[in-house]
């Protein structure tokens, strides 16, 4: 089941009702507007959905390939995008990049100034890392290091990004100019998420080997580290437990509270929003086990949040912005992923090339209590390794 958002049952119910209303409106719009999907496409999508439920990944790869062929034949960018997303989850990054780029070109056409990986000399390069929904930063953070790699191909490169990420990207890629999304900028060549993935993200092994961590403010990192270290000699572990999304399945509060109580670490909340009701349930009477630092608000100051994350020894989190940021900074992390086939996390293996220092633990039909037991064992191994080596990332 999904945790009550931040510990408030009322907010959880209201949010769920809102989701149902949005789904109803979307269904109604689908009935009365836009082209109808051919019966063959609907049957193919139903087949793919059944394979996902059975977790038949070999069968799904074949089904996804059928979906891609159908999408290409029908010139259907939405179906093509879905096939690309599925291939990434299945670990076929080359096919995923190809389909996503083709889907974008079908929707918007191929631009004459589209960058395809060539050296640009004196030509300027504009790299757009802007999502339609500024609250959704996972894809932006994932592709940020690819933007830095692309910037090296031009004497003058500009990266356009959501304002909260300007500082950390500018610090990480000082040779580029990083500007907020609202800035009107032009370039001789233009690159998007899809172009970056096509140029740099088709080989999973190379993607992992070429990892460049985002660089948090070193002075702020040290400030947070000293503050938290003054409270404990235990390892410092970031924790993010909940989501506003009703489509995500995450551990409930009693399961998280048991995990906290059983783990020899000092936890630091990385959860966004109004979390005080949740803190009471997670601490379970032991306030000292979980630090809540109200000087940090990731919705306002992502650079400060990045420094807080970088100050920690490890992170345990569900799939959210904290997961992507911890992975992109290079903090050893444990990512808890549900069985819903809707995010970029892999469905097989325990690693993702996007974040080489992260460990992916999928639910795989188990109770969350057992998943958290595994997370505890993997976290213990991470902390033991850190204690045996000089600190540094």
Regions found by a protein language model. Name each.
Residues 2-393:
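Catalytic machinery of carbohydrate-active enzymes
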């Amino acid at each position: 089941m999904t945790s009550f958002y931040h510990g408030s049952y009322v907010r959880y119910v209201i949010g769920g009702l809102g989701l149902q209303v949005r789904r109803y409106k979307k269904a109604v719009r689908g009935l009365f507007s836009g082209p109808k999907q051919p019966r063959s496409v609907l049957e193919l999508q139903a087949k793919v959905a059944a394979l996902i439920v059975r977790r038949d990944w070999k069968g799904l790869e074949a089904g996804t390939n059928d979906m891609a062929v159908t999408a290409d034949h029908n010139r259907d960018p939405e179906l093509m995008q879905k096939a690309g997303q599925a291939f990434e989850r299945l670990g076929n990054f080359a096919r995923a990049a190809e389909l996503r780029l083709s889907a974008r070109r079908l929707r918007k056409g191929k631009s004459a100034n589209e960058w395809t990986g060539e050296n640009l000399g004196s030509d300027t390069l504009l790299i757009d890392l802007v999502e339609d929904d500024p609250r959704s930063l996972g894809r932006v953070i994932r592709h940020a290091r690819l933007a830095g790699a692309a910037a090296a191909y031009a004497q003058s490169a500009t990266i356009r990004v959501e304002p909260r990420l300007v500082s950390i990207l500018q610090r990480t890629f000082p040779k580029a100019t990083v500007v907020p999304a609202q800035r009107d900028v032009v370039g001789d060549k233009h690159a998007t998420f899809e172009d970056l993935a096509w140029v740099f993200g088709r080989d999973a092994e190379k993607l992992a080997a070429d990892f460049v961590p985002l660089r948090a403010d070193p002075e702020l990192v040290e400030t947070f580290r000293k503050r938290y270290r003054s409270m404990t000699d235990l390892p410092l572990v970031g924790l993010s437990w909940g989501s506003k999304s009703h489509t995500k399945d995450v551990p409930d509060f009693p399961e998280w509270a048991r995990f906290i109580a059983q783990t020899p670490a000092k936890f630091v909340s990385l959860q966004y929003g109004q979390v005080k009701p949740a803190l009471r349930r997670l601490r379970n009477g032991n306030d000292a086990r979980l630090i809540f630092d109200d000087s940090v608000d990731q919705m306002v100051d992502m650079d400060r949040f990045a420094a807080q994350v970088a100050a920690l020894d490890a992170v345990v989190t569900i799939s959210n912005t904290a997961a992507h940021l911890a992975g992109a900074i290079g903090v050893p992390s444990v990512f808890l992923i549900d069985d819903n086939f809707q995010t970029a996390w892999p469905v097989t293996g325990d690693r993702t090339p996007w974040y080489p220092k992260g460990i992916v633990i999928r639910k795989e039909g188990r109770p969350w209590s057992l998943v958290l037991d595994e997370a505890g064992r993997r976290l213990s191994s991470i902390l033991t390794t850190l204690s045996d080596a000089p600190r540094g990332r």
